[in-house]
Curated annotation (Swiss-Prot):
Organism of origin: Deinococcus radiodurans (strain ATCC 13939 / DSM 20539 / JCM 16871 / CCUG 27074 / LMG 4051 / NBRC 15346 / NCIMB 9279 / VKM B-1422 / R1)
NCBIfam families reported in the protein's UniProt record: glut_race (TIGR00067)
UniProt keyword terms in alphabetical order: Cell shape, Cell wall biogenesis/degradation, Isomerase, Peptidoglycan synthesis
Classification lineage: Bacteria, Thermotogati, Deinococcota, Deinococci, Deinococcales
EC number(s) recorded for this UniProt protein: 5.1.1.3
UniProt name for this protein: Glutamate racemase
Length: 290
């Protein structure tokens, strides 16, 4: 398949005026969106939630690559200047393929093992992730690069239940706390003092994690680092939008717009006490296919 060129987008606006595309399997990428809006408040964003196919974590490698490519192609078709793949599972399997196919910056997520290794005092770091992220190579690569030379033990915890709970609006619920207690108790017993949130849905579980484990773990995620990296990539490419303005966010979803709207009103990165997403009361949400 030939590369998809940025010039194929139908929007005639200058490249710097185009929005940043953000993609996730569902609502998890909203935690990354919140960081992008803090780091790049002047930028417009087009967010695509592939909620018809969430969760990605238990899907086959081929399915993950195909769904991710279709979603990114839809963002490119609508006209974006860069794409942030705000999904750890999609990043684990698709970044190389996406960068070969699409001629615009593709920014992915890397599990935040490096800062967790730097911060640990116990020498034990936990990683909470989906089966897909644990199956991919990105996590193994960063463990090999940062944890092993430092002599830090990395313990992995996996769940297929947490993403559906967040998507159902139950991030701060008894059901979520039961699952978290089961999967994280072995990490706490082993002395982990840092917990890498290896899925963009998981910052929304911070309140439930703290309710069960108090300050046992410092919670570490990639959102702020990805936002800084996006700003640097746009700056190097002359793609930063100038002017004193506040960017707008538009949303695409592959299933129920009303459900995504409800999640936008309730989800808070960092848990129940976190700041709400800085979105308008009635966000523009369009149903799409990929």
């Amino acid at each position: 398949m030939p590369p998809v060129s940025f010039a194929a987008a139908s929007d005639p606006a200058p490249r710097s005026a185009l929005p940043i595309g953000v993609f996730d399997s569902g609502a998890g990428g909203l935690s990354v969106l919140a960081e992008l809006q803090r780091a790049l408040p002047q930028e417009d964003v087009l967010y695509l939630a592939d909620t018809a196919h969430v969760p990605y974590g238990a899907r086959s490698d081929e399915d993950i690559r195909d769904l991710t490519a279709r979603a990114v192609a839809e963002l490119v078709r609508r006209g974006v200047k860069a794409v942030v793949v705000a999904c750890n599972t999609a990043s684990a399997f698709s970044l190389t393929h996406l960068r070969e196919r699409f001629e615009l910056p593709i920014i992915g997520l890397v599990p935040a093992v490096k800062p967790a290794v730097a911060a640990t005092k116990s020498g034990v770091v936990g990683v909470l992730a989906t089966p897909g992220t644990l199956r991919g190579t990105l996590l193994a690569d960063v463990i090999r690069q940062w944890a092993e030379p430092a002599g830090v033990r990395v313990m992995q915890a996996v769940s297929t239940e947490l993403v559906p709970l967040v998507e159902a609006g139950k991030a701060d619920s008894p059901e979520a706390r039961v699952v978290l207690r089961d999967v994280l108790e072995p990490l706490a017993e082993a002395g982990a003092d840092q917990l890498v949130l290896g899925c963009t849905h998981y910052p929304f579980l911070a309140g439930s994690i703290r309710a069960e484990f108090g300050d046992t773990f410092a919670l570490v995620d990639s959102g702020a680092a990805v936002a800084r990296h996006t700003r640097n990539v746009l700056s190097r490419g002359g793609l930063l939008r100038g002017g004193d303005r506040t960017g707008e966010v538009s949303y695409l979803t592959t299933s129920d717009p009303a459900h995504l709207r409800a999640l936008l009103m309730t989800l808070r990165p960092g848990g129940a006490d976190g700041a709400s997403l800085p979105d308008p009361p009635s966000p523009r949400i369009e149903l799409t296919t990929t």
